[in-house]
Amino acid sequence: MTEQQKQATRDRIGLRIATLRKLAGLSQEQLSERAGLQRTHVSRIEAGKYAVTLETIQAIAEGLGMTVDIIDPALADLAPLKRLT
């Protein structure tokens, strides 16, 4: 994967998280508290400055009251795993 492709992925996921957060009526501070993350971390993820791990996506999804596949449909196969734990 090229750096350009990696950045495009970070941008896409960041934009999706920001959109879902706003639709949920949450501030970055509220989401960060719910997800157990620093507000600056959420801000940088939304800006596409950080590559996110699956654990972070799971924490954000839980903070939003959603499953990981809502954030990134490519993770649809992993959503049932969270339900089992």
Label every PLM stretch briefly.
Residues 28-29, 46, 55:
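Acidic-residue sensor for enzyme active/binding pockets
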Residues 36-51:
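Recognition helix of helix-turn-helix/homeodomain-like DNA-binding domains
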Residues 53-70:
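DNA major-groove recognition helix of helix-turn-helix/homeodomain DNA-binding modules
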Residues 70-85:
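Short, charged recognition helix plus adjacent turn
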